[in-house]
Amino acid sequence: MQKVFEALASTPRRKILAYLAHADLTAGEIAARFEISKPAVSQHLTVLEAAGLVTSEKRGQFVH
């Protein structure tokens, strides 16, 4: 439960969740919408996944 609250405490992570609620996006696609680096998006996604709020799926060379 603590991990969920920590994940949701970040405004960028809440925005990422809102985007992912409507479409499967890669870190690169999310980064383009937020104008932040892909590594920063990947870190946010790692926190969200650790909290059980998102899952990842590899499709070819991309992770969705």
Where in the sequence are the language-model features?
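N-terminal helix-turn-helix DNA-binding core of bacterial DNA-binding proteins
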Residues: 2-37, 61-64
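Histidine-centered divalent metal-coordination motifs
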Residues: 13, 43-44
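Alpha-helical residues within the helix-turn-helix
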Residues: 32, 43, 49-50
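Beta-hairpin "wing" of winged helix-turn-helix
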Residues: 49-60
